[in-house]
Amino acid sequence: MNTFLIDYQRIQTPKKGFSRLFCDYTSDTEARAKLVSNCFHLDYRKDADYYRHLGLLASRDFKRNALVELLLKQNSRFGGSERQRQEIEKLRSSRCMAIVTGQQTGLFTGPMYTIYKALSAVVIARKQKELFPEYDFVPVFWIESEDHDFDEASATALFAGAGLETIQAEGGHRQQDQMAGPTPLGSGITETVREFLDLLPDSDFKPEIAELLHSAYTPESTFEIAFATTMNRLFSNHPLILLSTQDAEFKRLAAPMLCKEIESAPASSYDVVAQSSTLESMGYPAQTKPRAVNLFYLNQLGQRLKIEQPSPENFMILPDRQRYTRHQLLEFCQDHPERFSPNVILRPIVQDAVLPTFAYIGGPGEVSYLSQFRKVYERFGLVMPFVIPRGSFTLVEPKITRTMDKVLKVTGKPSFSRRQVYEALFGNLQELRKSMVSGAENQNLDALFEQVESEVTRSLSTLEPALVKMDPTLQQALAGSSGQIAKIIGNIREKTYRAGRRKHDELLQQLDKAELNLFPEGVPQERLINIFYYLNKYGPSLIDDLERVLQGYSTESHLIVEL
């Protein structure tokens, strides 16, 4: 696999690139140093921070045995392997730390970055073990199943034919604002799986994929269980641990943080506002806006309802307008923590209170919003873990690689490399198109044909005096021959131009196909396309291949991998 690294700063996809904050965070600039010192607690580039955080986590009192029992039960439910069970058991020791990542449940695992997050956690856990052999590091995947964005959780996309197809699952009976994870798949899921499989071309690997999806996505299952079962099958040979936050046992572990949010509301929101002000003074926009209470209330139907704070000591649950005093709501949370769900601001706080989180592996958006939460961590008496960018890939199929070779020939200078073609493609696609048009038309041809015509005319003119001297009638024959030669050259010129235009059109069509493959709907491939499109063509070993690529490279650059 040929692999090329591109700095995030160079990437500008048709719809949008990466935020300036994320580009600075992955750069080697003064801006990064300022960002880290003002918005994060730890810098993953500083060795001293590693030793400091290891000592801190080893000394903290986590409910490790309760956590292990919960994870064992969950992973058994999700079809976890013996290797995963062994990884869970390691968490009983105070010298075991978690490398955490996570994502919302997605149909058939959703966009490819879900897989890349899991792989990144596995690889970074292994690298930390190599650096600190006296400690254990286990990769934990937090399943965000309490999110109520059902449209996102129930859809996925893949390439089909000459375009893009989106598959949407209807799900069983569902209320508005109901959590996506526990939603039943319903009777329509069998047809959804069939539609998805029909879009995959026949291959040696398709029967195995069909068996996996049909067994995981059954009418009586839920979006969360199907997602977790599929992830466990894909990572059965890897030490990945899945964590669901829906279980009442987990909420009991999280109860101190949930209750503290109610007890101190709206203090954490003020913390976010203050940290956001620091960000904005550095020129970065705030990504997340806090609420007075950064919790949702879960009713009996599984709906996530907002909690408002109309006055300092009074709370209201919307839209039902149930009213509680602070004391009443706090007592309710202490007795029934399973009825509360953290929002995007409190979620990482709960995560790092329950888990011995050494590092969080996040995407560009997560790095941005975590930069707003430093003061919230401090309020809850926590140190923010290392925030490490996840692995980011673009997979380039052989047909697209061949197009890149043609682009290289048309636009290339003697020293132009394939990597520079990718940089041009990811950096300024329109400029690359102009280069291709210019290269295909070959503006030097006009001058070359004019030079040939001039030389032929001059050569024939040189013959004329000698021919006339020999026989005056030859002058007419010479003139006729000159006209014929000019006509022949003109015909060759026209055929050359037609070939150039045809080549130009073919190249642009091929570039359009490459653009669809690399930037479907104008966004990076990893944010939209489902991994099974590639597993069907290249086999389940593709996940192992990408793991090896990640093992050899930093996640601070985007990785272009030619398959």
Swiss-Prot record:
The keyword Magnesium does not apply. The keyword Coiled coil applies. Its EC number is 6.-.-.-. Residues 494-518 form a coiled coil. InterPro entries: Bacillithiol_biosynth_BshC, CC_BshC, Rossmann-like_BshC. Keywords: Coiled coil, Ligase. It comes from the Bacteria. It holds the Pfam family Rossmann-like_BshC. GO terms for molecular function: ligase activity. Belongs to the BshC family. This is Putative cysteine ligase BshC. It comes from Chlorobaculum parvum (strain DSM 263 / NCIMB 8327) (Chlorobium vibrioforme subsp. thiosulfatophilum).
